[in-house]
């Protein structure tokens, strides 16, 4: 696969984006922030709920239904503003995060990973859109694979390995074709 224009590297104790230190020459309240990778946890960019009993909880007020592609569309549309405000990175997760905060019970099924460890194509298409836009903006996303409350949906150690290998493969497991 072709290399992405935005490359992340570590040089001693600082992050580099495309060969340049992040926040070059900048300070905050007298502290050097050059080389840091400021990020925000935005785990729900590829979110969907496969549980019919809980899916309606996330419906949009204007349509009365949940739409995972709209969720990703809105996420992608907001990214330039985040970048303009100085955010260089965000954390996204293939199993999302708890949509209600730190819930004890998580009946929803938000996993982009099937029980056998294969990566769900619809989640990967949404992730590809986010990663492509991040690349265009010169951002370096952090992609998480598992999330507590959803990790039990992956069957066994072999499935865990399959998910990790798929996510860490060429282009982060993101398919080169079939993007929207």
Language-model features: locations:
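Basic/polar N-terminal segments that are highly enriched at the extreme N-terminus
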Residues: 1-5
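Active-site-adjacent substrate/metal-binding segments within catalytic domains
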Residues: 6-140
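Active-site groove signature of glycoside hydrolases
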Residues: 95-96, 137-153, 157-180
């Amino acid at each position: 696969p072709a290399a992405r224009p935005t490359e992340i590297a570590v040089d001693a104790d600082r992050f580099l984006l495309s060969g340049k230190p992040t926040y070059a020459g900048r300070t905050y309240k007298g502290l050097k922030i050059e080389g840091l990778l400021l990020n925000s946890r935005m785990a729900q960019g590829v979110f969907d709920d496969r549980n019919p009993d809980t899916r309606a909880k996330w419906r949009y007020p204007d349509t009365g239904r949940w739409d995972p592609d709209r969720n990703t569309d809105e996420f992608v549309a907001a990214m330039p503003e985040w970048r303009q405000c100085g955010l260089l990175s965000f954390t996204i997760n293939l199993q999302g995060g708890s949509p209600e905060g730190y819930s004890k019970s998580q009946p929803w099924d938000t996993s982009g990973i099937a029980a056998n460890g294969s990566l769900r194509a619809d989640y990967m298409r949404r992730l590809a859109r986010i990663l492509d836009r991040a690349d265009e903006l010169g951002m370096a996303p952090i992609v998480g694979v598992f999330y507590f409350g959803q990790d039990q949906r992956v069957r066994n150690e072999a499935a865990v390995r399959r998910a990790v290998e798929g996510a860490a493969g060429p282009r982060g497991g993101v398919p080169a074709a079939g993007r929207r």
